[in-house]
Amino acid sequence: MKLTSTAALASLAVAATAAPSTPETFGLVAIRSGDAVQYAGFNAALGSIFAGLPKQNATCEGTDSGFATFYIKDGALYLYGSEETQEIYVDRSGMGQGLIGYTTGDNASGPRNSERTGWSIDENNHLVFDGNSLIACPNSIDSAYSIWASAGVANPGGNKDCVGIAARVEKTENPIACTYSS
């Protein structure tokens, strides 16, 4: 009996250490009924996050789906890749007004007032920052929407006609590692 229990515990310990190293990854889709951003997938390019960008020009280990793949670790949001770490930041200061961007490299820092943690998936399966939904602003590069965090500014960064969106999480089963342009 004792030997069986010991063997069972040993096999559980091996199974726990053999857990897959791939984080739980997901894509994001903008939800805003009655607006052109509705169902636009999220993209990463030029150090920023967009919705509906026609080409993100990422360097991938397979075919670029055209959409960014994300994961959350310890409240921080990352782009899924195999090379250097690409971490999302938010600048809610008066200067940043909710700017969302990303840095490349383990020691890269964002703007002076940037925040790295506060990301989560809420009970409705939406990505939120500090419990708040995101904002999409039209007329960015290639007619895409730029994505911003809520910082109490309806039209951040001098944009016009911005709308609040829900960023619906879509789990990815077989993520493709990419490096997104800075």
Curated annotation (Swiss-Prot):
Signal peptide residues on this chain, from the entry's feature table: 1-18
GO biological process entries: conidiophore development; phialide development; sexual sporulation resulting in formation of a cellular spore; sporocarp development involved in asexual reproduction
Keywords carried by this UniProt record: Cell wall, Glycoprotein, Secreted, Signal, Sporulation
List of glycosylated residues: N57, N107
Expressed in which tissues: Mainly present in phialides and conidia.
Gene Ontology, cellular component aspect: extracellular region
Gene knockout outcome: Leads to reduced sporulation and division of phialides instead of forming a single flask-shaped cell.
Keyword Secreted annotated: yes
Disulfide cross-links: none
Subcellular location: Secreted; Secreted, Cell wall
Chief location: secreted
Function: Cell wall protein involved in development of asexual structures such as phialide and conidium development, and thus required for spore formation. Plays a role as a general stress protectant produced by the fungus in competition with antagonistic bacteria.
Stated name of the protein: Cell wall protein phiA
Source organism (scientific name): Emericella nidulans (strain FGSC A4 / ATCC 38163 / CBS 112.46 / NRRL 194 / M139) (Aspergillus nidulans)
